[in-house]
Amino acid sequence: MIKVEIKDETFYVPTSWDEVTIGTLLKLNELKEKKYTSNIDQTAEVLEVMTGIATETSLELSLDDFKTLSSLLEWCSEMPTEDKTVKEVFIDGVKYIPVDVSVMSAGEFISLEVFQNEKSADKNIHLLASILIRPEVEGEIEKLKDMKNIQQRADLFSDKMTVGQYWPVFNNFFVGAVSSSLKNTQVSSSQQKSKLKIVNS
């Protein structure tokens, strides 16, 4: 974080997605739906979401100071692109592990598709994270329970999981393993321990 002071007030500007929560990303996505009269207005709102600097405060700065401040966030115009693997995430002392596509059930894929295919998919990032990353219980990844359980974990991730922690999981899953619904179910059916027995054909 970069520490900045404006009128004796202290603010902190993140330097990468590793310092930005999923909840903040959700707020940024909401800004994409708004119409602005100028780029300065839009930038001021991005600054408020990312740093807590009120739009009124940033718009009172000189143009040079405003440009200097906004330049600190140029990196956020693109999502993380580095190729890395996240094997585990610890939040409040609890270990969370990305789910393995090969052991996901058809029902779990349905839950993913529901949130991914909605027009408001950008608002569901925390819910997708809640399905893709789950707590480890007795050495195994916890099974999905119900919507209340998904929502509770989504709220936790929104507050405490960073975009840097989540985005590699999102990319690895949706760009790679989940290129199509049919492919997903075929991969899951072939690799997961089968519960299906064909008795007569």
Residue ranges and their predicted role:
Residues 1-201:
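Charged interaction scaffolds used for protein-protein
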